[in-house]
């Protein structure tokens, strides 16, 4: 009899699914009620403030891709809330008073910020604090582009979203949150994944682009797009317990291709969905991205041009290292570059980097013949029929502790070759002629393990197609998914 251990292994009562749906609907309705209450309070405060409070009362309603019109002209209010003589109305003075009190920022800094337009690419772990702070600080027009929906496993780090928005568009969720914090700005929703076919059209409407994505081909694409449009690019990254931040293509700083003309090996490109990330780490980097975008927009301070900030969460250490300058030989921003907008739209970034343009899991590999693989259902039948076998789980030990199929033996793939004698002994204990079935999270590492095992003489080794992910989909829907 197969058993699973780990959170979620106990079956819900028959009405559990219905109860969960009702609770989710209640959360959604309560969130909508809170939003309406907030808008009512805002309108009431504007009425109490008199004529000054009416300035921009209906701002922030732009939602379509056409709401931001033309070459950096995305503006939230007539004159961005400033009087003809350049003075601020009472409501803006009160809202941004702590900015205005800063000698290095003051009225001029707020004016420049309110006249700027910034595009945030990605409404995830980096984009969440980034968008919230840009909205709260009063950027004139905030564009948000993302093609994904909110998932429950986003919420530990993507703090702009709420449980009530699970299953809904990330852009809508993020835009609603930004409008709740500041209804006086314009928020433009781009419900797409940014691609070569739409990136130029979207990005050319904004003054500054901020890369808050999590994959290599998109980084190259956004950098190339900003070079073609001559836009500054604030780029951040966070993975595991580390993060980094810099400003590309601004004040003589290099573009991404200047530093990395050749993509790194696929094995070196990790993703949050594979390697994990502590929730606060993208929060730290996202806040710093907002700071850099504000510095670029206002001309206040020294942006991280030609420098890269490195953050180590475990040691609480921040270092800033110098980068080499823009390369005159760069194929995209160099003096003799012939890269055009037409070239950009035809460029295959996934083939160039050998990576998918998605923040989700990497694509499945297929390196074994069909005879060396079995499905989850075939394995379940084998186990239920009591056929002698050994189930080998080759995930890292900390993955095995999250959830596993019992009984199974855990030998991480990285240690498999040195543990072969112990594996051989365990296989003998399982009985003569026992099958060796190999399992991992998604069915990729298990194939690599079977390749190694067959080379070392374990001729009957087979892997389970799709791994534990397929097990949860096809055999046990209550098995914990991570």
UniProtKB/Swiss-Prot annotation:
Binding site residues for Zn(2+): 255, 258, 330, 333
InterPro entries: MOCS3/Uba4 (IPR028885), Rhodanese-like_dom (IPR001763), Rhodanese-like_dom_sf (IPR036873), ThiF/MoeB/HesA (IPR045886), ThiF_NAD_FAD-bd (IPR000594), Ubiquitin-activating_enz (IPR035985)
Cofactor(s) the protein requires to work: Zn(2+)
Pathway the protein contributes to: tRNA modification; 5-methoxycarbonylmethyl-2-thiouridine-tRNA biosynthesis; Cofactor biosynthesis; molybdopterin biosynthesis
GO MF terms held by the record: ATP binding; metal ion binding; molybdopterin-synthase adenylyltransferase activity; molybdopterin-synthase sulfurtransferase activity; nucleotidyltransferase activity; thiosulfate-cyanide sulfurtransferase activity; URM1 activating enzyme activity
Compartment annotation: Cytoplasm
GO cellular component, one term: cytosol
Reactions the enzyme catalyzes: [molybdopterin-synthase sulfur-carrier protein]-C-terminal Gly-Gly + ATP + H(+) = [molybdopterin-synthase sulfur-carrier protein]-C-terminal Gly-Gly-AMP + diphosphate; [molybdopterin-synthase sulfur-carrier protein]-C-terminal Gly-Gly-AMP + S-sulfanyl-L-cysteinyl-[cysteine desulfurase] + AH2 = [molybdopterin-synthase sulfur-carrier protein]-C-terminal-Gly-aminoethanethioate + L-cysteinyl-[cysteine desulfurase] + A + AMP + 2 H(+)
Binding-site positions, ATP: 125, 146, 153-157, 170, 214-215
Cofactor notes: Binds 1 zinc ion per subunit.
UniProt main location, coarse: cytoplasm
Keyword Nucleotide-binding: yes
Gene Ontology BP terms: Mo-molybdopterin cofactor biosynthetic process; tRNA wobble position uridine thiolation
Annotated Rhodanese domain residues: 385-480
Xref: HAMAP family: MOCS3_Uba4
UniProt similarity note: In the N-terminal section; belongs to the HesA/MoeB/ThiF family. UBA4 subfamily.
Protein function: Plays a central role in 2-thiolation of mcm(5)S(2)U at tRNA wobble positions of cytosolic tRNA(Lys), tRNA(Glu) and tRNA(Gln). Also essential during biosynthesis of the molybdenum cofactor. Acts by mediating the C-terminal thiocarboxylation of sulfur carriers URM1 and MOCS2A. Its N-terminus first activates URM1 and MOCS2A as acyl-adenylates (-COAMP), then the persulfide sulfur on the catalytic cysteine is transferred to URM1 and MOCS2A to form thiocarboxylation (-COSH) of their C-terminus.
Listed name of the protein: Adenylyltransferase and sulfurtransferase MOCS3-2
Species of origin: Zea mays
